[in-house]
Amino acid sequence: MRRKGLLPLVVLLMTVCLGSNVFAQGQPTVHAVQSVANQTTTVEGSLKDGVKLKSLAWAAMSSNACFPATQNAKFTGNHVFFVTDLPPHSIMTVTVKPKNGSTDLSIYGYQIAPNIVVLPEDLRSCVTCEADHKWDYPKRGQTQTSARSIRFNAIGNSYKIFIGVAGANGLTEGDFTLEVTLKQ
């Protein structure tokens, strides 16, 4: 019996079944959020239910341009994932608010084709990617709160919006409220 050739086959099958990513805590859950025209949908979440990503390199790729690698520390905690639909001729604002104002959260989201869901580490390109996190320095005329917001705009096509709420500086615990406001 020839066992030598079995290992490459097993590795190939594991790669096909698991995908290209193996998350530290297993495959993540992606929570569906039903956005409603001209309303705000609110969902509760917790970083405890999230996973740490092996790599943040996808975010700084020029085809994604989500956030620069100099800001990676703000996304090193657990990530909790959400997905919603963005219909044509609409603007969506997504805001995360920590239950405890001292919890340092970050948010990112990307706009992709309406018929797919792509996890962050598998993202090779997107229509647009937005992120918000704690500022390194004050901005003239602006005051930052613990809330973080991102915004998307659809002109003639519908899109899928993938949202990630992340703990900053390795944070793995913290409850939050996610608000999805859709204007048509």
What do these predicted ranges mean?
Residues 25-28, 35-37, 55-184:
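Acidic, Ser/Thr/Pro-rich low-complexity intrinsically disordered segments
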Residues 9-21:
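Bacterial N-terminal signal peptides
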